[in-house]
Amino acid sequence: MDDNNSDWTSYDFGNDTIPSPNEISLSHIGTRHWITLVCYGIVFLLGVPGNALVVWVTGFRMPNSVNAQWFLNLAIADLLCCLSLPILMVPLAQDQHWPFGALACKLFSGIFYMMMYCSVLLLVVISLDRFLLVTKPVWCQNNRQPRQARILCFIIWILGLLGSSPYFAHMEIQHHSETKTVCTGSYSSLGHAWAITIIRSFLFFLLPFLIICISHWKVYHMTSSGRRQRDKSSRTLRVILALVLGFFLCWTPLHIVDLLILVSDQPSERFEVNLNLAHVLTLCLAYINSCLNPLLYVCLGRGFKENLISSLRSVLHFASEAPTHGPSMTTNSKSTTDGVFREKPV
């Protein structure tokens, strides 16, 4: 159960309620709590411009291609996820008090996890696509088209919506006092909470992680098998390690903490405070993955940095010239972005 602002550890089980870490004042956390807010702010400041830049380059400064569709949708999902941070930081700075009402509680929680799930699924699709480019090059040349990529991206958004449906359905506000309202998840039984946690961890973490690892390992193995390719194998290995470690390190702690929350039935007050802090910090790590994606999946791609610089120069050139020079700038810019994403694996 993931939520940085709402208490996903407080489930309504009829007459039995798991103690809520949010019922313990965050003033006990002190400096660490504000450090967490600073971390969230840094993620916002890095993730928003980074992903917005990728959206701009892939959506407006390069030709339509399969890779462009992958990275455009990935950047949109990560951008929307990062844009939600300021709203979700408000309760964190107010002792978990949710001031936005019941509808916003459901919408912000559900949409946030929808974006995260779409991001994970897109990483899987990118890995499988690179695997097919290496193992089935002829098939990809005949069947790999931007139209199919757009359809698959649409399906991914639908799957992300379905995966986040428990958050839309079970998030609600609870009044802890006259001045404090908490956005929390309410379930009918502990078994129900366990089922959702296990299914989510398998479908949106364990299975994607295995697919990403196997796909990239196969890509590395095949691209380094020939003598002419060995010079590039070390760079390929570095990129693959960055991709796999980035995904693993950003997502594993969150799922471990989620399981600890369910296992710890009646923890001590000190343990509850530490567990709540750990949950917030591991959510920050998951957010960091949204910052790393543009760097790992785009900036390490062939030709992206050169074409990004070229596009920025074109914009500056356009801004400094008269409007009559606009068409020539557009034509030149178009020609410089043809190689942003080559239809080959890294």
Swiss-Prot record:
Q: Which parts of this chain are annotated as the region Disordered?
A: 323-346
What would be an example GO MF term here? complement component C5a receptor activity
Task: Enumerate composition-biased segments (Polar residues).
Answer: 327-338
Spell out the SUPFAM superfamilies in the cross-references: Family A G protein-coupled receptor-like (SSF81321)
| Protein's UniProt keywords contain Transmembrane helix | yes
Q: Which UniProt keywords apply?
A: Cell membrane, Chemotaxis, Disulfide bond, G-protein coupled receptor, Glycoprotein, Membrane, Receptor, Transducer, Transmembrane, Transmembrane helix
Q: Which residues are noted as glycosylation sites?
A: 4, 15
Q: Localized where?
A: Cell membrane
Q: Which cysteines are joined by disulfide bonds?
A: 105-183
Membrane topology of the entry: Multi-pass membrane protein
The UniProt record lists the keyword Membrane: yes
Q: Where are the transmembrane segments?
A: 34-60, 66-89, 107-128, 150-170, 195-220, 239-261, 280-300
GO annotations of cellular component type: apical part of cell; basolateral plasma membrane; plasma membrane
Q: Which residues lie on this side of the membrane: Extracellular?
A: 1-33, 90-106, 171-194, 262-279
Q: Which function does this protein serve?
A: Receptor for the chemotactic and inflammatory peptide anaphylatoxin C5a. This receptor stimulates chemotaxis, granule enzyme release and superoxide anion production.
- In Swiss-Prot or TrEMBL terms, this protein is called C5a anaphylatoxin chemotactic receptor 1
Source organism per entry reads Danio rerio
